[in-house]
Amino acid sequence: MKNSLGAKTIVPTTPVWVVGTYDREGKPNVMTAAWGGVCCSQPPCVYVSLRKATYTYGNIVERKAFTISIPSENYAKEADYFGITSGKTVDKFKITGLTPMKSDLVDAPYVKEFPLIIECKVLKIVEIGLHTEFIGEIMDVKADSNVLNEQNLPDIEKLKPIIWTADMTYHKVGKGIGQAFSIGKEI
């Protein structure tokens, strides 16, 4: 018999994404969000869910754009800092020593040191409740060449992304267990 855990947002794992925006004055800001994912393949889209109280929320509404910078595990402390400190009062880039880079496609910055970047224009804003879902159409994905495989796709073992868990901890991604759309054919 399974135990009822109640109606809660305790999905076992979510990606750790760093959302990049500019404020009204053009100051670059980043915020870590663990509520995000892919939501459409045509047009290619991702979503991030943010509370209205965040500085990033207002920046996205104002600028209609954001980036997703995917940190590797060696940047876990910086990614956590980006999520626990407001950009209203501090310059997160200055404090962490990381570098804001201007996107050439959207009105938002990304983190130069992070190996994978997704550049998005806001396609739709969905008010749900405490959180608002920002759906961003992907304009481009940029990656450092050292995290790509032979097919020119991100290699998760080279990328070393961070995942967030329901018990409020960060984790590394483990080894692959099989090829998608293939291992099921063995049944």
Task: Tell what function each PLM region has.
Residues M1-I187:
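Basic, polyanion-binding surface patches
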